[in-house]
Amino acid sequence: MIKGITSKELSIIKEILQTFDAKFYAYGSRVKGNYSDLSDLDILVKSNKNIIPELKPLFDNSYLPYIVNFTDYNSIDEKFYNLIRNDLVEIK
């Protein structure tokens, strides 16, 4: 479960993500529950190609009240993945 976001915000996030052929997982403080109102939303992107440059402007223009940061699964360090893997929440 992603914490600290409204159902309207989640709908905006899902609407943007559903246009891409990829899997998306939230992680970080908004999953763990140790977030503040100023916390960003961290999203791990699993895709056959790097779609992050396409995602960023869509979220920058989405009027969400927080920053959304993306991490490409194909380029992350194994140690970092091991730190976050138990906290991954798929965004469907």
Regions from the PLM with identified roles:
Residues M1-A26, V31-L38, K46-K92:
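Catalytic core of pol beta-like nucleotidyltransferases
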